[in-house]
Amino acid sequence: MSMLTRRGVGASVFAALFASSFAGAQAPQTVRVRGTIEKVDGQTLTVKLREGNTLAIKPADNARVTAMIKASLADIKVGDFVGVTAMPQPDGSQKAIGLHIFMAAQRGVVPTRFLPWDREPGSTMTNADVESNVADVDGQIMMVKYSDGEKKVIVPPNTPVVRFAPGDTGDLKPGAQIFVMAGQKMPDGTITAPAINVGRDGVAPPM
């Protein structure tokens, strides 16, 4: 084998090893998690998912815990920053299946936007400011505005509404329902959670 050939083979092997190492160092998969805490063991939460299976969630160092407390449609005022989980309607409006009211401190941190969601097949999420909120025979009609658009939202009377509030690890206890927006799936199958939203006093996350 010539020196040139040996160098070529060596370069190919090095490139393959480099590519393999790079693939192994890729960022963990980001996942959303909805479920109920079954057990707390040190820093590990055993969570039963709505699909019926369980997984282990480990809050990251300095994980942010945000509580969700029960609220109502009457609590939503013009100018509030809200998240609307909804189903698109034929006329282009959105029919809410859940609403959450952000804390003032979350404005500017949580982006205003409209995007596909996975609460139900075909569902959407709109983080936006409430421009109007009027009573209607079918509930409430809200106009909400986000960074590059606005949506008409129909809110039936039985739509679950929650308000975000400061929380802490004391809220993470058996029976509490949680939502993890951006968990990181680790090679061992556990989920590392940089932030956890947790229902307080039996509240279920509506998003």
Give the positions of each predicted feature.
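Short, flexible, surface-exposed loop segments at domain boundaries
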Residues: 2-8, 14, 18-207
